[in-house]
């Protein structure tokens, strides 16, 4: 006879462990356990059967893999947590004795510091893995970079997040890796392509943030600690890959004056070359004063390069790269006209980086400077000016500068009487920057709203600026990531390109029928009101019921007895339709005669109506034929495939109906606009 298995030694009871058991096994507190799980990427699991996984009768809600907790037993961070707990006890003991100085000394000198370098290397064995997990990191760090400092969010954390985010933005500007952006209700979405990986993150708008008490900032601070370490590693690797020194030089005074991106100076590190400062936002390129290589070493290096023939080898690939860059991007077309649309390759980084290169922009005070500066620089613009109130780092603070080609304005057109007066310049010439009256238009300059910049980068080309003039109704700002599907509504395409055969004519006929029905109802209502008034005037019965004659009763009995079936009713309805058509024809003749026109001039309408009716019949016959063919094909399918086909047809029909509604709405709006 075999051994009886003990309960909880195999199966789900062995594979899963509760959170309370895990905390006891690791011998740490619950907050430290949460931090450790966040750092190591260990998350709760849901067993198939909670009853079998639980060793007790209490309804447990949080389970972990037993192997994950066993893996945490060997984590070096556990020793740091225990050291922190011991130091916290000593600090509490000193504060209890009233020894504040000793407590401050213990906190400053003996508090252990956590290092997450080994955790980053364990979780991301390759650099591509780190790039794939960068979306949430950037979104959270950009969020904390825009938060106000509170007791839960210290200023050091905010400054660290701002510095890391600006360093990452500088890499995107230098390599022209930014691809798309979208203005949404939540904030501004950005998408960049780095080493073939698409990275998307969200940046909140710069409004006054109100920190609520219902948010657990301890958990978010743990994620911030991990993500700052991760982004620091990523920035170092990215800067090293393009030959830049990391971290870049940071000007604290310029940052205090609101320079932001312009407070950083990027330096290249070349073999045998002195580092050169890369223009990051300042108008004048600052040259770095670093250690110069001695002339003797440089001469020896040049001799070695010439003797090895490396300089000639370098020239050949350069010529090849220029030839490759001159080639146009291939366009992939489907083999069949009804096949799926193939994704087309995007613009290269060099083409995207030169979109705004030949222009000089000036950002007005009411426009959002930070996102506009980042996007314009990422797409090749080197000269961006703004008002001195917005901070340092501008190409020019003078709004009347003749080199400015585009000005971004985000205020409506106001009458001159409502505009404020401009103070006169001082006589001693202290006010070097000339003030311009609000609403003034300088000749030779293009004025656009901020949406023009976003639509240009999403389209990959410069769109018409007259559609984005100040005060104009802007075109819809569409998401660049939503691609129109087959049979769906495409707001960018014209109606003629996407509407089905005869859809416009049928829509017009339905609109005309609805208008005619509304007019008929109005006419009937007026006629009813007139007949009621006539009845009131001509009533002689005095409110008494008058008995009908015998002839009337016999006529009603004959009408009830004379029922010849449904065929006679259909014939009668057809005759009534013919009489109605003749009546309308006669009415049109009378209207033409009253207008002094021959009726032949109005005959075109009847011909058009006949053509529309025949076309509608053809379309209906064609649809009926297609449906019959589809039914014949479904008969040859198996039940499983037939059910699947019916689901597909149903979903496609719903999508086409929604698209038809949107096209009809757009058709009406365009018709009203042309009136």
Curated annotation (Swiss-Prot):
Subcellular location field: Nucleus, Nucleolus; Nucleus, Nucleoplasm
Biological function: Component of the NOP7 complex, which is required for maturation of the 25S and 5.8S ribosomal RNAs and formation of the 60S ribosome.
Alphabetical keyword list: Coiled coil, Nucleus, Ribosome biogenesis, rRNA processing
A GO MF term: ribonucleoprotein complex binding
Homology family: Belongs to the pescadillo family.
GO biological process, one term: maturation of LSU-rRNA from tricistronic rRNA transcript (SSU-rRNA, 5.8S rRNA, LSU-rRNA)
Designated gene of the protein: nop7
Protein name as annotated: Pescadillo homolog
Region entry Disordered, spans: 308-330, 474-675
UniProt xrefs under CDD domains: BRCT_pescadillo_like
Start-end of Basic residues biased regions: 612-623
Annotated source species: Neosartorya fischeri (strain ATCC 1020 / DSM 3700 / CBS 544.65 / FGSC A1164 / JCM 1740 / NRRL 181 / WB 181)
Composition bias type Basic and acidic residues, residue spans: 308-317, 518-529, 581-591, 624-634
GO cellular component, one term: preribosome, large subunit precursor
Biased composition (Acidic residues): 497-517, 531-540, 548-580
Keyword Nucleus among record annotations: yes
BRCT domain location: 351-470
Pfam families: Pescadillo_N
Subunit: Component of the NOP7 complex, composed of erb1, nop7 and ytm1. The complex is held together by erb1, which interacts with nop7 via its N-terminal domain and with ytm1 via a high-affinity interaction between the seven-bladed beta-propeller domains of the 2 proteins. The NOP7 complex associates with the 66S pre-ribosome.
């Amino acid at each position: 006879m075999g051994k009886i298995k003990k309960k909880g030694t195999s199966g789900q009871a062995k594979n899963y462990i509760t959170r309370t058991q895990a905390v006891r096994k690791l011998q740490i507190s619950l907050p430290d356990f949460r931090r450790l799980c966040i750092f190591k990427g260990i998350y709760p699991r849901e067993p198939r059967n909670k009853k079998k996984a639980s060793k007790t009768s209490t309804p447990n809600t949080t389970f972990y893999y037993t192997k994950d907790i066993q893996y945490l037993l060997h984590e070096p961070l556990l020793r740091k947590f225990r050291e922190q707990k011991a130091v916290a006890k000593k600090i509490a003991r000193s504060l209890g004795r009233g020894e504040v100085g000793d407590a401050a000394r213990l906190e400053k000198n003996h508090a252990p510091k956590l290092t997450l370098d080994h955790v980053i290397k364990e979780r991301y064995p390759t650099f591509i893995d780190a790039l794939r997990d960068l979306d949430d990191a950037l979104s959270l760090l950009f969020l904390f970079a825009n938060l106000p400092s509170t007791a839960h969010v210290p200023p050091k954390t905010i400054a660290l997040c701002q510095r890391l985010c600006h360093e990452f933005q500088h890499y995107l500007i230098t390599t022209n890796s930014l691809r798309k952006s979208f203005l949404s209700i939540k904030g501004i979405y950005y998408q960049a392509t780095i080493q073939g990986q698409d990275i998307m993150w969200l940046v909140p708008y710069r409004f006054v943030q109100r920190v609520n008490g219902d948010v657990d900032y301890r958990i978010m601070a743990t994620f911030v600690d991990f993500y700052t370490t991760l982004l620091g590693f990523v920035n170092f690797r990215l800067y090293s890959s393009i030959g830049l020194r990391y971290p870049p030089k940071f000007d604290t005074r310029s940052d205090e004056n609101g320079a932001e991106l312009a407070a950083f100076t990027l330096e290249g590190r070349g073999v045998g070359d002195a580092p050169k400062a890369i223009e990051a936002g300042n108008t004048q390129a600052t040259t770095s004063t670093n250690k110069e290589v001695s002339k003797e070493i440089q001469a020896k290096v040049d001799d070695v390069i010439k003797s090895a023939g490396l300089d000639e080898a370098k020239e050949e690939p350069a010529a090849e790269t220029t030839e490759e860059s001159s080639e146009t991007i291939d366009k992939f077309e489907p083999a069949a006209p009804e096949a799926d649309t193939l994704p087309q390759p995007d613009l290269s980084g060099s083409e995207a980086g030169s979109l705004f290169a030949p222009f000089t922009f000036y950002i007005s005070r009411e426009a959002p400077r930070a996102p506009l500066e980042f996007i314009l620089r990422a797409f090749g613009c080197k000269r961006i000016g703004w008002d001195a109130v917005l901070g340092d780092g501008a190409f020019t603070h003078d709004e009347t500068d003749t080199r400015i080609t585009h000005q971004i304005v985000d205020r409506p057109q106001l009458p001159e009487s409502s505009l404020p007066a401009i103070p006169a310049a001082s006589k001693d010439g202290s006010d070097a920057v000339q003030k311009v009256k609000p609403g003034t238009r300088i000749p030779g300059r293009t004025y656009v709203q901020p949406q023009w910049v976003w639509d240009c980068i999403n389209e990959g080309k410069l769109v018409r600026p007259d559609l984005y003039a100040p005060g104009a109704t802007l075109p819809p700002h569409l998401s660049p990531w939503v691609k129109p599907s087959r049979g769906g509504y495409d707001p960018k395409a014209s109606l003629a390109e996407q509407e089905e055969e005869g859809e416009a004519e049928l829509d017009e006929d339905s609109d005309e029928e609805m208008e005619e029905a509304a007019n008929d109802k109005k006419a009937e209502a007026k006629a009813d009101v007139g007949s009621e008034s006539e009845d009131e005037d001509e009533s002689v019965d005095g409110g008494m019921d008058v008995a009908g004659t015998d002839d009337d009763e016999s006529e009603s009995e004959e009408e009830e007895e004379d029922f010849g079936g449904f065929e006679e009713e259909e014939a009668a309805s057809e005759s009534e339709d013919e009489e109605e058509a003749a009546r309308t024809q006669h009415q049109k003749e009378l209207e033409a005669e009253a207008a002094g026109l021959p009726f032949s001039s109005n005959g075109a309408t009847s011909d058009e109506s006949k053509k529309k009716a025949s076309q509608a019949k053809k379309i209906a016959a064609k649809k009926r034929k297609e449906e019959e063919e589809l039914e014949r094909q479904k008969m040859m399918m198996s039940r499983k495939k037939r059910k699947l086909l019916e689901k597909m047809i149903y979903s496609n029909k719903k999508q086409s109906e929604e698209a038809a509604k949107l096209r009809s709405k757009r058709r009406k709006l365009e018709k009203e606009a042309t009136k």
